[in-house]
């Protein structure tokens, strides 16, 4: 029987980024999904400037590198590197661009102020991930997005890459975490994010008054949602409760791995029945 394919898109991953709850949670998922769930895996994340290439033995994948990612008529070179996770044969692909990711901090400066171009970084990373998967020639059954940086992936798969056969049968899961990074709505957001000739009106679910609300938009376009944290703001909690799609409740560190695999398989079963 052909193995099902799981694409994990991570904004953080232990041991490559800071030791956070999200980074630790995601780190255990790929190996478990492969060994216990029987999945074939690909793991993609940004190549932040904070990642030590020598320590983690990153090397460039020449056959995948050399693409330019076009955002609002501007070209951004994409370099793809790979490394094996410690004590594992599991490979992680790192998406590198000097303009957006070669910095001393991940999401905010030394004073804790979020980078002004975080919304552009989200656009770039989301498009770069999908272009990389196309280059793989590898059609994912499940696309599991973790964190705000991946929030545009569900929209892009559904609307900007809807004519790409490689994504025709993908089920998209968005894991939402209790994080607030983006804030005020940049005036050029819809223009920049409407990639591949997409209608700007498709970005409306991401707009919440004068705020850029990546959770609201990701909830709208994802096929299913996983609660990565136990608690959220009242507004986020209410949005999750009102979703008319599958939601996996928060799972603690002892239960989340088998529960995620079961959730994947339920979603794939529902898709195959349609």
Identify the role of each PLM range.
Residues 1-274:
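Catalytic cores of nucleotide-sugar-dependent glycosyltransferases that transfer UDP/GDP/TDP-activated
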């Amino acid at each position: 029987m052909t193995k099902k394919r799981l694409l994990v898109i991570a904004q953080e991953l232990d041991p490559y980024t800071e030791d956070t709850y999200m980074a630790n949670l995601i780190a255990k998922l790929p190996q478990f999904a492969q060994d216990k769930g029987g999945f074939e895996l690909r793991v993609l994340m940004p190549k932040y400037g904070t990642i030590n290439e020598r320590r983690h033995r990153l090397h460039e994948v020449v056959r995948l590198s050399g693409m330019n990612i076009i955002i609002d008529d501007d070209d951004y070179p994409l370099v793809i590197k790979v490394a094996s996770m410690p004590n594992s044969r599991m490979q992680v692909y790192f998406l590198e661009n000097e303009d957006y990711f070669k910095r001393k901090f991940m999401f905010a400066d030394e004073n804790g102020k979020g980078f002004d171009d975080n919304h552009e970084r989200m656009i770039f990373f989301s498009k770069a991930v999908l272009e990389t998967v196309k280059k793989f020639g590898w059609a994912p059954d499940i696309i599991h997005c973790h964190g705000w940086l991946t929030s545009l992936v569900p929209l892009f798969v559904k609307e900007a890459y809807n004519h790409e056969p490689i994504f025709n049968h993908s089920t998209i899961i968005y894991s939402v975490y209790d994080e607030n990074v983006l804030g005020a709505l940049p005036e050029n957001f819809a223009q920049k994010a409407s990639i591949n000739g997409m209608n700007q009106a498709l970005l409306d679910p991401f707009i919440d008054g004068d705020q850029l609300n990546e959770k609201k938009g990701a909830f709208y376009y994802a096929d299913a949602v996983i609660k990565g944290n136990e608690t959220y703001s009242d507004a986020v909690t209410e949005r999750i409760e009102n979703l008319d799609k599958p939601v996996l409740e928060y799972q603690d560190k002892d239960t989340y791995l088998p529960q995620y695999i079961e959730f994947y398989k339920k979603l794939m079963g529902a898709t195959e029945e349609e």
